[in-house]
């Protein structure tokens, strides 16, 4: 507990982080995004009104919250402009409260072209990216040919960087992937225009965070995707292109390890996954379809149906361990209402042996067969319940079992999409 809290996904993403971030941003100094791009879709429902954010921190709907985008985030100019415009049209003040690190890399048109052409060429072996250029933008960052926010304000340098990048990427696009080249002049002009647009928002995010900590202000670090999609610790190669784990909050903003006081891991009461990759507890039957329908399990960014399955404690314990999770938030408990029985994977059968540890590669995960523990379901309606004692006995027993099996206390339970459909058992900021 303390003044700086990291909120991150403890599964494969889509756990409901946006709502929880919004809930915790009352009396907040700042909310900061530290990795990913506009492939994240954070859905907020406040008083019945739905808002989907892809790039801007979820705290933007709090009038007094400062919203920061750190150096670890890759920024699509078009996506940022669109999101700012939509929020401002809805009466939300954005540009005076949004601060963006000059070290944040840009997603350029050639990154999008590469992403989409590669996925198409891969066919059945595609990773299942959103096709929005996230991965190629991170590739350029590591290869030191990326274009960052800071570069937009030095036209001669920008021109040189862009020509070098296009010489490389257009060769790959035309000669290897067989698609059209990206035009230099159009890309250059658009980049310059975005430089003018973003200039008032360009700020030293790390410096702001250090100052806020000195002032004793609350800061919330908002993760995107989930721990099991981490480029290093996830089901590689079926992962995202950034560090979605707690280390990403440090490297992606410029703060030290002592700046983090509490790590809140978000997990659904069951499990979902989008795109390719191993998913040991996946349900390819009417039970899985029922969960998908009741939980509206379709991507906020892409609309793709999510794969659904039982809670996987082996995977959850891995997320708890690699992130040093202080407390869990279990979301979508109400989706399980009316189910006669529930299953929880407590171990895997892997190459003839039982193990409680997940393999470190996708092929190993594919070979795992879940070992289940069965729990009674409940017929009562839990939707919108905000008091622990009012939950059905079976629901409370299920949550306590998850807590014990994961070896981590449950701090928050969500029983519906609205901000108010939540019970806080332990305030991370208390």
UniProtKB/Swiss-Prot annotation:
Pathway: Purine metabolism; AMP biosynthesis via de novo pathway; AMP from IMP: step 1/2. Its EC number is 6.3.4.4. The active site is at residues 14, 42. It comes from the Bacteria. Substrate binds at residues 300-306. IMP binds at residues 14-17, 39-42, 130, 144, 225, 240, 304. One of its GO terms (molecular function) is magnesium ion binding. It is an enzyme of class 6 (ligase). It catalyses: IMP + L-aspartate + GTP = N(6)-(1,2-dicarboxyethyl)-AMP + GDP + phosphate + 2 H(+). PANTHER family: ADENYLOSUCCINATE SYNTHETASE. Homodimer. This is Adenylosuccinate synthetase. The lineage of its organism: Bacteria, Pseudomonadati, Pseudomonadota, Gammaproteobacteria, Lysobacterales.
